[in-house]
């Protein structure tokens, strides 16, 4: 039996037990969530080096970092270094979104190096291979696409991002919608180009039962990619985006009936006042499926600072119910992120996730903050740095100050509020 079947049969699997320990919840809570479809467990049994990660209602908000080969930039060694940096920074998952070069070799390295669940977007490789084989990606055959999907699942990929809900009807709506930025999804735009060139329905939608058969065979989670995500605030929650969400809701139901774990991807650029509505809409139309959001970016003008932009949107979206944040780096809209920007993007997304977990009342999040606050009150710098979301940077900043051995912070020095108040209240920690 696969994970959903086990959960529905009342059986608690080792993966459910592992997730329960990580999350500080009961195995029964995890089992019920998997059975209901409000929790997915990212793991492929063919990978021995991966720790299962739970995503969904009642669990910690998770973060994903994206890497991959793009054009002439970097190489496999560079992307592997980014994976290691993202893992060290605390990402919960890695997405290998390679679009060129030796995609097969890159994926093999990603699966070997990452101890975290790995996701891919098989369409990228299928399009690249079709371009080499037939001279153009628009000549890709259905069989080529499904072959790559199965190869990724068989290789051990833990979750597959697939544009199953981008239908020809939605493409026609988008054509007439008057969007400022008609299409910003890389995979979605290539798929739609194929559909229009061939005058064919999306094969991932037309042959969705075949998608389900592969996912069920390998017990792989499907992540419904969004071809119609808004690329600017003005396009948020327009007809094509909402119609695609309606279709995805129907496919969520079919996936669950087939015993396949599924989550939904969204949304891109969303103004603050629409964040809650966007999440509520997904939860309603997609039957409570876990929501995996890119950003969201709450302004269009933050070039060079989009990791901060995304952290704002991510925190509010996760507070509203989104459970999985796709990181955004400072290089977004400009170029390919370097290792430092990858690390910075993960930390920014983790801060957003943690802020939402606090707002949502998760005990583990609250205790983490309280522990650091106690250490701060006691001027216990070693403990503060260890508890910081980025201990390496916190420690470096502490060491860079001229009086690093002093008890108080550099801002207040001998007038440290913690030290003075503790002295008068008789709560000073004399061992500091």
Curated annotation (Swiss-Prot):
Its EC number is 4.1.99.23. Binds 1 [4Fe-4S] cluster per subunit. The cluster is coordinated with 3 cysteines and an exchangeable S-adenosyl-L-methionine. [4Fe-4S] cluster binds at residues 409, 412, 416. GO terms for cellular component: cytosol. GO terms for molecular function: 4 iron, 4 sulfur cluster binding; lyase activity; metal ion binding. PANTHER family: PHOSPHOMETHYLPYRIMIDINE SYNTHASE, CHLOROPLASTIC, THIAMINE BIOSYNTHESIS PROTEIN THIC. Together with BzaB, probably catalyzes the conversion of aminoimidazole ribotide (AIR) to 5-hydroxybenzimidazole (5-HBI) in a radical S-adenosyl-L-methionine (SAM)-dependent reaction. Is thus involved in the anaerobic biosynthesis of the benzimidazole lower axial ligand of the cobamide produced by M.thermoacetica. Requires BzaB for catalytic activity, as BzaA alone displays no activity. This is 5-hydroxybenzimidazole synthase BzaA. It comes from Moorella thermoacetica (strain ATCC 39073 / JCM 9320). The gene is bzaA.
């Amino acid at each position: 039996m696969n994970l959903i079947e086990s959960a529905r049969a009342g059986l608690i699997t080792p993966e459910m037990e592992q997730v329960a320990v990580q999350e500080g919840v009961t195995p029964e809570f995890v089992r019920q969530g998997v059975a209901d479809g409000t929790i997915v467990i990212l793991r492929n049994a063919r990978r021995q080096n991966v720790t299962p990660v739970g995503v969904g209602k009642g669990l910690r908000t998770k973060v994903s970092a994206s890497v991959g080969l793009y054009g002439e930039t970097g190489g496999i060694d560079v992307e592997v270094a980014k994976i290691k940096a993202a893992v060290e920074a605390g990402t919960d998952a890695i997405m290998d979104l390679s679009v060129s070069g030796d995609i097969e070799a890159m994926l093999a390295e990603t699966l070997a190096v990452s101890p975290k669940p790995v996701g891919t977007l098989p369409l990228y490789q299928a399009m690249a291979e079709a371009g080499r084989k037939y001279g153009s990606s628009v000549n890709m055959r259905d069989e080529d696409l499904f072959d790559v999907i199965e190869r990724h699942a068989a290789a051990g990929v833990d979750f597959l991002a697939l544009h199953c809900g981008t239908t020809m009807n939605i493409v026609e709506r988008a054509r007439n919608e008057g969007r400022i930025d008609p299409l910003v999804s890389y995979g979605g735009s290539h798929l739609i180009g194929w559909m229009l060139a061939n005058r064919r329905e999306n094969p991932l939608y037309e042959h969705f039962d075949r998608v389900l058969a592969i996912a069920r065979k390998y017990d792989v989670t499907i992540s419904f990619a969004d071809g119609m995500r808004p690329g600017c605030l003005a396009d948020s929650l327009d007809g094509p985006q909402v119609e695609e969400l309606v279709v995805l809701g129907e496919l969520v139901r079919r996936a669950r009936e087939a015993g396949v774990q599924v989550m939904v991807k969204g949304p891109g650029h969303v103004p603050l006042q629409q964040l809650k509505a966007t999440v509520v809409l997904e939860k309603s139309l997609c039957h409570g499926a876990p929501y995996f959001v890119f950003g969201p970016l709450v302004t269009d003008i933050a070039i060079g600072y989009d990791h901060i932009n995304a952290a704002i949107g991510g925190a509010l979206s996760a507070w509203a119910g989104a459970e999985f944040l796709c990181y955004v780096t400072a290089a977004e809209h400009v170029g390919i992120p370097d290792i430092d920007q990858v690390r910075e993007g993960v930390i920014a997304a983790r801060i957003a996730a943690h802020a939402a977990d606090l707002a949502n009342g998760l005990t583990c999040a609250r205790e983490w903050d309280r522990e650091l606050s106690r250490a701060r009150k006691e001027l216990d710098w070693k403990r503060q740095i260890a508890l910081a979301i980025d201990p390496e940077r916190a420690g470096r900043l502490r060491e860079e100050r001229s009086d690093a051995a002093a008890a108080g912070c550099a801002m207040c020095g001998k007038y440290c509020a913690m030290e003075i108040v503790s002295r008068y209240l008789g709560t000073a920690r004399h061992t500091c």
